[in-house]
A protein has these predicted regions:
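A conserved helix-loop-strand patch within extracytoplasmic ligand-binding domains
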Residues: 97-150
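A bilobed periplasmic-binding-protein/Venus flytrap-type ligand-binding module shared by bacterial periplasmic
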Residues: 110-121, 244-257, 280-281
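Pocket-flanking alpha-helical
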Residues: 41, 60-96, 183, 203-207
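C-terminal lobe and pocket-closing loops
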Residues: 204-264, 268
Length: 313
């Protein structure tokens, strides 16, 4: 009997030590390569530290983040965009490989975009057929007369869209959002026609006048049934979703190992205006990502404190 009691006590002590170890492990927060995601990640990290949770930031591509979340080598993604991430997110949540941690108030759109002055050269815009007819105006010296569309490094089927809609464009994939804004600033300064990947919420809408290209309205069948849409031979003969969702995701173990942090994450909620203003702190006001996060954190204490569950304060 005494031996059994000792064994039980030892086992309980072992599990207690394991729980303490898990609670003291760093929460691994994913950072990608666009401003709002990076700053919101650092804001989230600061909130977690008020709960006594140590954090670290894991820089990883959007394509690699899913495996990291599924394996538990990363814990938190604060921005899951419907337009670029819905397929992987939905599949992995359905497979119970990752966890849906809730939805922001913000609604999203990701699409081809142009500055308003381009309409003087191509007056049929924002209709996509006008863009197709005006392709030559978007050519560059090394594009052999093809229009150039500047894409980001995210998972968009732009080349498939160009093929399906028979557009005389080539897709140039840039490495980051910063490189997109370099091209935009250069073109805007000289009033050069440009069409590039843009999204909302984003700081661009507070700095530049412009519009999204209006492609055929998105339907899920556009991605799975060639017969659907304007071209019965190819998929992706449509635009991207409008008024898309912006979600949060975690590893499956996160809610058990970090209960208060998980409950807080579910409460964290940003709207379009907040995300645009946060992005502008970096891309317009030239703050670092960390400084922007600190500034927002200090100026919005009542808001983020309202996200903390009462039992965790």
């Amino acid at each position: 009997m005494q031996r059994s009691f000792i064994q039980l006590a030892s086992l309980l002590a072992f599990f207690s030590i394991c729980q303490i170890t898990l609670a003291n492990e760093n929460i691994k927060i994913i950072t990608n390569n666009w401003t709002s995601q990076i700053v919101l990640s650092h804001i989230t990290g600061k909130i977690f530290t008020t709960l006594g949770q140590p954090v670290e930031y894991v820089k990883i591509s959007t394509s690699d983040q899913w495996g990291a979340l599924a394996r538990g080598t990363a814990d938190v993604q604060i921005e899951v965009w419907e337009g670029t991430m819905s397929d992987q997110f939905t599949r992995l949540v359905s497979d119970r490989s990752i966890t849906n941690a809730g939805t922001h108030t913000a609604t999203t759109r990701e699409e081809w975009w142009y500055p308003s002055y381009v309409e003087e050269i191509c007056p049929g815009l924002p209709d996509w057929q006008a863009l197709r007819a005006c392709a030559e105006f978007f050519a560059r010296p090394d594009s052999q007369g093809n229009g150039v569309y500047y894409a980001g490094p995210w998972e968009k089927p732009d080349e498939a869209k160009v093929r399906a809609l028979n557009m005389n464009f080539e897709v140039r994939v840039l490495r980051s959002g910063d490189e997109l804004w370099i091209e935009l600033n250069k073109a805007y300064k000289n009033k050069t026609p440009i069409v590039l990947f843009n999204w909302t919420p984003n700081w661009v809408e507070s700095r530049f006048n412009g519009r999204f290209v209006e492609f055929p309205l998105y339907q899920p069948a556009c991605e799975s049934d060639p017969i659907w849409g304007v071209n019965p031979e190819f998929l992706y003969d449509c635009g991207n979703p409008k008024d898309g969702w912006l979600k949060k995701a975690t590893s499956t173990r996160f809610s058990d190992e970090n209960s208060c942090a998980f409950k807080t994450l579910k409460n964290i909620n940003f709207n379009n205006q907040q995300i645009s203003e946060i992005s502008a702190l970096v891309d317009v006001d030239n703050h670092s990502h960390q400084a922007a996060a600190t500034s927002w954190f200090e100026q919005n204490k009542p808001l983020w404190r309202s996200w903390l569950p009462p039992e965790c304060q």
